Each structure stands twice: as C-alpha cells, then as structure tokens.
C-alpha cells in the first residue's frame, strides 16, 4: 500500500510539474508472438477529408482518455498472461498498440503495418500466403463498428484473427464477409431486442427512433425498427443525426427532427447513436427547449462523460439503457497509476529506449504524442468504464486459442515452427475461455453472449449516477420499485397513439401506423383472441360467443323438447282433444242404432272419429330429438287420418246436398251410391289417393334431419327440414278438395223446418279447417325454424278441435241432454218414412 501511494505521489508530482512522460513508448513490447492493437487514443475535431487531395497523414488533435485506458487494459492482460505459468508457459506475448484516431484513413496505416512481413515494413505480394508470417499474430480492436467493417475485410483476406472490444454492428456477424472477425461484446441485435422488450414491458408502443449517421447508428436503427415493427411497436418519427464534423446544412436537419418529435404525442425516444452524435442532438434539444422525454440510450453513449457533462442535460428527461455486464478488475486503477508513475521515471524511460530500438515511427508517425502529457486526473473518470473488461478479455481469448494451437500443458509448450495467423484462427471458432472467473465463448458467428444490466440515470449534483433497475439475459427483468421518472408524482410516462382496447375489442387501424386505431366490438359469434388482434376471430360452428367476448363456448344441442312450456300446453290440449274424441266415439258406439248416429253415417261416423283421434295423436311425432324415421312419418301420419275423417264428412255433406237440392228421382239413385259399400269404396279411394301422394312426397322430397349451427345464437338446432313447399302443398290438396266440396255442398243448403240442421255443423267444421290451415301457411313460413314444429302441432290440434266442436260435440249434447229429439223424424225425415214403408228398418247396413 505504501509503495502504491508513493507511485501515485510520484505520478502526481511529475505530471503536475509538466515534465513529459514516456507513456507512448510503453505501447510496444517485443515477444515470441506479438498482438496488434487498434485504439482510439485521439480524435480529429476537423478531419477535412472532403478537401483531402493527397494521401497524407491526418492529425489527431484531441486526446481520448478512454482509448488510452482500453490500451492499458490490453497491456495489463498481456503482462498477466506472461506472468502466469499455466496458459503459455515458456512463451512471451508482445504487443504493438496504435492510435486509430476514430478515422478509417488513420486506422489503415497500422493495419498495413501489422500485415508487413516480420522484421520489415514491407507487405510482399504472393499467390499463396499460407507460409506468410506477418509482424503480428492477431489484432485486438478497433473499437467502432465503422472502422471494424473496413479493417475486418482487410484482415479477413489474410485470415488474420481480429477481436474487437467495441464494434457491435450485426453486419460483422456475417461469416462469409468477415471469417476472421470476433468480438468480446454482444451484437447490436441483442441490445435492440432488449430495447424492444423494455418498451413492451413499460407499455410504450408509440416512440421516435433516432440514430447517428454512421455505421453504428444506421445499423442499430435498422435493427431496432424491424424488431419493433414485428412486436407491434410503432415508430412515429425516424431520423439520423449527422456527425459533428459534417456541414452546417446537414446539422440544420436536427432542428427539424426535434420539431417533429416535439409536435407529436411521442413521450419516448430511442437513441441508437455514437457519443459525438448524441452530444450534438442533446445540444440542439436543450437549445430548442424540447419538452422532457424518456430517452432509451444505446450502450455507446449511456456512460459517456461527453454527454453526461453537457450543460442542461438534467432537464432532458429520463435516461435509461442497457449496459453490458463484465467481471470487475479491481487491480486496474492501481495498474494505471503504476504505468503513469513509471512513465515519469527517467531511468525507466531510458531502459525502454535501449530495449526497443527502431520503432518505425518514420513509417506510421508518432504513436500517441498526447499520451506523454496525460494527467491522472484526466484519466480517473474512466477507470471503471464497462468496456475496459472487453479489451482485457480479448487478450485472454487470443491467448487461450494460442494455448490450444501449441498444445501447451502445465510443463510447457512443445517446440514447433512458429504459428501463423490462419492456424490460430482454426482454434478461435467456438472457443471457450475464462476471464476473471467468467466463462466466455465465441459462437459460430464470432460473438459472445453477454448479459446486460438496465441502467437509469439518477442525478447527483452536476453528474448522474448509474442505478441498476433491471437485467436482460435473454429475458427482461425490470425492478419497477427502483425506477424514477421526470414526471410529476413520479408517474410512469404514457406513450401510446391510442388507448388500449378493452376485452372483446379489436383494433381498426387508422392511417399507416398499426398503433393508431379505433376499438371495435367483436359481435356475437366472434371473439378477441389476443389483445393485438386486428380482426375478430370466428368461432367454430360448434361454438358460440356473446358480444365483446374473449372466448367461445360450446353450443348445446337443442330441439323441441317434451318439457318445454309450449309443448306441455299442447300436450294438455292433446289430452283434451283425445278425451273429447273418446267421449264422442263412446257415445256414438253406445247409441249406434239411434237415428242421430244413423243420420251421421253410422259406422262411418265412428270411423271418422277414430281418424280424428289419430290426427290428434300425430302431434306426438314432433317433440323429442328428431330422427330419420320420425321425420319421414310426420306428414303421412297426419294427412292419411285427416283424409279418412274428411272423406266421411264429405259423404255426409253429399247426402245432405242430394236430399235437399236434387229432385226425388235423382236423389234416391244418388243416395244409394252414398251409402253402404259404395260409401266405403269412396273412403278407400280417397285414402289410396292420399297414400299415393304421401309415397310420392317421401320418394321425391323426403324430409331430412338437419343439424343447424347458425339459426340459434348459443345452441345447435336439430330439426326436420321440409325440402319443398310445393310438395308440402300437394299433400294438403286432397284434404283441401274434400273440405271445399263439403263446404260447397252445405253452405247453400236450406234446412227444412222441424229437422236437424246437419249442414250448418259441416259448414262450420270446414270453416274451422280452412281458417286453421290458411293461417298456418304464412305463420309457418315466417316463424323461426325452431318454432315451426310447435306451430304445426298447434295447427293440427286446433283443426281437430274445430271439427269436434262444430260437428261432433253438438250431437253428443243431444245424445246426453235432449234424448226426445233423437227420433227418425227429426234426423231422417223423409228417409225415415221411406225406410219404414219399405220395411227396411232404421239401421244402415
């Protein structure tokens, strides 16, 4: 500890006195295998590349303390490898570190020097470089994606392993273009995925996306935009921020971009930018007084002092972003202090000059003249920078690959001819190595999968501190209780174009953005499958749903059930009708020899009553679950008994018409045809004709059992479907004709005084028939299909009750209450006298 304090004091005193250091001469060390290094030790404030007419040198005027710290991290790692007895025993790694000035024209010079033949400054031209031995075995760096895209293609031609500690563009994962490129940072794709998941977690789907106008910003912005669109996040505005050294005309576009963002409802801005472009954007936003926003930062500028120390940054809003995790290097600050202290020691500097003659500075220029005037205070702010570990780990990755290539063990590395870069490259693929207890592995595309911390800027005095508020390791975790916002009451900002739709609603997009929409209710039979649906999903045919539903329910099988109230009422009506039929039939049988029964047709009247009872019983075919047999039997078992009933009534009406309207000579002849066997023959013919119609109906247009999924909102209806209205009407044709003839034969008949008016009963019976079935047709055609069987049952029973009430029940009343009228003169009249004189008796035979 005392020695460390002494070294620190020496460094402070030496640097404070303004004495030049020899730190730049510590950027090179000889070894059995040398690693090249490309670091942004300085930057050029005004490169003037557009005015460059000769391939001369570019002067780096501004010093970058972070670049120097990353270079020292590589230097420290090489020295640790050399001091370890297990990784490369008996061998010594060297390093050769150069400044890139963050410019391609500067980075290409040391890149060419790395590929020069060992021991010279020349690159020889060969048809085959298999046996070629360049100055370095592998290259660490560069830091930026823009430089890595250039140097990566160059080194890939020679299959020179290159491990970057900061280039994150996803284009570098292309193995066909960059077969020798590796990196100890994750691809921008991982960071973009984390950003999109963060927006989803916090409910922000209406954002602005801005990137720097360089490879890092353009590629990152493109990745983020495609991933955001795939996740339903809409980008209201998208733009690029020019780099500071571009023309003032292009820099003026920043104001227009900020104006668009300020005029919109966007409360969240994703800034995928390099440090210098981010500083430019915030300088303009502070000047233009942009309303505070949430800024989702990319890793490149999240921890940048250049941005953090910008005056007015505390007023821009909330800043949060993802920072790659890494293992701590607690010895690194003291190592930096040691390097600075040694650089101020003249004896140490003299020893470097003796050990490293011929630095070839006449070829590449001074390595880092600004490094010889650095202060410890200037470097202290970046001592704990997160990317220091990435530069440190890159050395260990190359060392482990060399260990595997040389087949080293605990006792040493077997002697062999020098390893060439392409041989080392073979052992870099899918390499697993450990750094500070952390296991790392290059995947098939040269990337390492690193976890991220979600960091939030929390302002303390003039500079923000980084608070960890979450993590991303393939899945996002956010610690909401640790979040703090710029809004009043520390409420989470809302950045949505439209409100979230409720349950059972889908989005109807307005314009070009899927996040701007109206909420539309899902109608019955459809449902909302997910909150992001644009269309309601139709339920399956065996399912149903109410309005604004989020699921479908199974349909219940339904039909005209026995227990339904309407069916129970009709069954009571059926019992009444059957009871009346049985009472009337019993009275007619009991009084079968009476004039009343004989005048009504005798046995034919009983037959007609029995058929009327069968008509009533036919309604029992309609309730219950329909089947093929019940569907086929419904109409024939209704119409055949009805034909039998109406045919007997037709004979009764014909007798009344003949006896009342025709001359006696004709009446006697026709009366004999309407009685006895001839009458039964007419009944049989009518039944046969109706049976033929029923047979044709069943063959040509058979009713079918139908499972109808859509006629009821929540149930599936099973019913018998009539296939033709014409065939249904023809089934009624014979019965309608018999009823019409009955009505026609009795309507105009004048009853004789002192005789029973049978014509009136038949007239009203036929009126009941026609009123029932004429009313049935429009009602049946327009009623819901679920109620059609009920309507037909009601029509059948009303028709039967109408005939009973108007024709049969009055006669039953006479048989029960007015027996004195049950005489031949009242019912038979002249027929009774004629039968009495002929001695034929009063009974029909």
Curated annotation (Swiss-Prot):
Membrane topology: Multi-pass membrane protein
InterPro entries: ANF_lig-bd_rcpt, GPCR_3, GPCR_3_9-Cys_dom, GPCR_3_9-Cys_sf, GPCR_3_C, GPCR_3_Ca_sens_rcpt-rel, Peripla_BP_I
Cytoplasmic membrane side: 590-601, 659-680, 749-760, 811-845
Primary location: membrane
Transmembrane portions of the chain: 569-589, 602-622, 638-658, 681-701, 728-748, 761-781, 790-810
Cellular localisation: Cell membrane
Keywords: Cell membrane, G-protein coupled receptor, Glycoprotein, Membrane, Receptor, Signal, Transducer, Transmembrane, Transmembrane helix
Domain of life: Eukaryota
Segments in the Extracellular topological domain: 19-568, 623-637, 702-727, 782-789
One GO cellular component term noted in the UniProt record for this chain: plasma membrane
SUPFAM superfamilies cross-referenced by the UniProt entry: Periplasmic binding protein-like I (SSF53822)
GO molecular function terms attached to this record: G protein-coupled receptor activity
Endpoints of the signal sequence: 1-18
GO BP: detection of chemical stimulus involved in sensory perception of sweet taste; sensory perception of sweet taste; sensory perception of umami taste
Pfam families, A to Z: 7tm_3, ANF_receptor, NCD3G
Glycosylation sites: 128, 262
Self-association and partners: Forms homodimers or heterodimers with TAS1R1 and TAS1R2.
Annotated PANTHER family: CALCIUM-SENSING RECEPTOR-RELATED, TASTE RECEPTOR TYPE 1 MEMBER 3
Role: Putative taste receptor. TAS1R1/TAS1R3 responds to the umami taste stimulus (the taste of monosodium glutamate). TAS1R2/TAS1R3 recognizes diverse natural and synthetic sweeteners. TAS1R3 is essential for the recognition and response to the disaccharide trehalose. Sequence differences within and between species can significantly influence the selectivity and specificity of taste responses.
Membership in a protein family: Belongs to the G-protein coupled receptor 3 family. TAS1R subfamily.
Protein name per UniProt: Taste receptor type 1 member 3
Organism: Canis lupus familiaris (Dog)
């Amino acid at each position: 500890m005392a020695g460390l304090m002494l070294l620190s004091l020496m460094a402070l005193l030496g640097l404070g006195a303004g004495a030049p250091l020899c730190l730049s001469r510590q950027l090179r060390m000889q070894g059995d295998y040398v690693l090249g290094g490309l670091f942004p030790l300085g930057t050029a404030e005004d490169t003037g590349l557009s005015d460059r007419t000769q391939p001369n040198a570019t002067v780096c005027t501004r010093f970058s303390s972070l670049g120097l710290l990353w270079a020292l991290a590589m230097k420290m790692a090489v020295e640790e490898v050399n001091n370890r007895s297990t990784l490369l025993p008996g061998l010594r790694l060297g390093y050769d570190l150069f400044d890139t000035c963050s410019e391609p024209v500067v980075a290409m010079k040391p890149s060419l020097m790395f590929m020069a033949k060992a021991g010279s400054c020349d690159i020889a031209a060969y048809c085959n470089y298999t046996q070629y031995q360049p100055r370095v075995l592998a290259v660490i760096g560069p830091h930026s994606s823009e430089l890595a895209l250039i140097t990566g293609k160059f080194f890939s031609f020679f299959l020179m392993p290159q491990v970057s500690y900061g280039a994150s563009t996803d284009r570098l994962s292309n193995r066909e273009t960059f077969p020798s490129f590796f990196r100890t940072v994750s691809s921008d794709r991982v960071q973009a995925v984390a950003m999109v998941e963060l927006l989803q977690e916090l409910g922000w789907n209406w954002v602005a996306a801005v990137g720097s106008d360089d490879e890092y910003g353009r590629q990152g912005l493109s990745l983020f935009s495609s991933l955001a669109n795939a996740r339903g996040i809409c980008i209201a505005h998208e733009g690029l921020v020019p780099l500071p050294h571009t023309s003032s005309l292009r820099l003026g576009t920043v104001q227009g971009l900020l104006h668009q963002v300020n005029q919109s409802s966007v409360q969240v801005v994703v800034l995928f930018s390099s440090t210098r472009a981010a500083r430019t954007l915030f300088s303009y936003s502070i000047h233009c007084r942009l309303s505070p926003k949430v800024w989702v930062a990319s890793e490149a500028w999240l921890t940048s002092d250049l941005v953090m120390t910008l005056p007015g940054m505390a007023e821009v809003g909330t800043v949060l972003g993802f920072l790659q995790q890494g293992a701590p290097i607690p010895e690194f600050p003291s190592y930096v202090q040691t390097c600075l202290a040694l650089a101020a020691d003249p004896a140490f500097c003299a020893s470097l000059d003796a050990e490293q003659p011929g630095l070839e500075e006449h070829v590449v220029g001074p390595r880092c003249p600004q490094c010889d005037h650095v202060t410890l205070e200037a470097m202290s702010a970046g001592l704990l920078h997160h990317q220091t570990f990435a530069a440190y780990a890159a050395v260990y990755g190359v060392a482990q690959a060399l260990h595997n290539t040389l087949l080293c063990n605990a006792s040493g590395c077997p002697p062999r001819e020098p390893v060439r870069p392409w041989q080392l490259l073979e052992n870099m693929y899918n390499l697993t190595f450990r750094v500070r207890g952390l296991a790392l592995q290059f995947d098939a595309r040269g990337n390492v999968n690193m976890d991220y911390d979600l960091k939030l800027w929390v302002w303390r005095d003039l500079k923000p501190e980084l608070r960890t508020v979450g993590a991303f390791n393939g899945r996002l975790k956010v610690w909401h209780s640790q979040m703090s916002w710029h809004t009043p009451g520390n409420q989470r900002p809302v950045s949505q174009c439209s409100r979230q739709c409720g349950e059972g609603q889908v989005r109807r997009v307005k314009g070009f953005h899927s996040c701007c929409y109206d909420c539309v209710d899902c109608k019955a039979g459809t449902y909302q499958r997910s909150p992001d649906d644009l269309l309601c999903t139709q339920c399956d045919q065996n399912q149903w749903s109410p309005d604004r539903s989020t699921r479908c329910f199974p349909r219940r099988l339904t039909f005209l059930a026995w227990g339904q109230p309407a069916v129970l009422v009709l069954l009571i009506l059926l019992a009444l009708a059957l009871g009346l039929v049985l009472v009337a039939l019993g009275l007619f049988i009991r009084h079968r020899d009476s004039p009343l029964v004989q005048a009504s047709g005798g046995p034919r009247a009983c037959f007609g009553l029995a058929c009327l009872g069968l008509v009533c019983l036919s309604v029992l075919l309609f309730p219950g679950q329909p089947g093929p047999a019940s569907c086929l039997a419904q109409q024939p078992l209704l119409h055949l008994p009805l034909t039998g009933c109406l045919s007997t009534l037709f004979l009764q009406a014909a007798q009344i018409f003949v006896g009342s309207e025709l001359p006696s000579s004709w009446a006697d002849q026709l009366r004999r045809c309407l009685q006895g066997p001839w009458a039964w023959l007419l009944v049989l013919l009518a039944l046969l004709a109706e049976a033929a119609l029923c047979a044709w109906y069943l063959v040509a247009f058979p009713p079918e059992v139908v499972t109808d999924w859509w006629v009821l909102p929540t149930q599936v209806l099973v019913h018998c479907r009539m296939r033709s209205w014409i065939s249904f009407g023809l089934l009624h044709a014979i019965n309608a004709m018999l009823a019409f003839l009955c009505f026609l034969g009795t309507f105009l008949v004048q009853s004789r005084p002192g005789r029973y008016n049978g014509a009136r009963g038949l007239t009203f019976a036929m009126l009941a028939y026609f009123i029932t079935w004429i009313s049935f047709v429009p009602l049946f055609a327009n009623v819901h299909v679920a109620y059609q069987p009920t309507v037909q049952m009601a029509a059948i029973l009303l028709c039967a009750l109408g005939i009973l009430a108007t024709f049969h029940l009055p006669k039953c009343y006479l048989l029960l209450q007015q027996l004195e009228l049950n005489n031949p003169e009242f019912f038979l009249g002249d027929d009774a006298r004629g039968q009495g004189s002929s001695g034929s008796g009063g009974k029909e035979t």
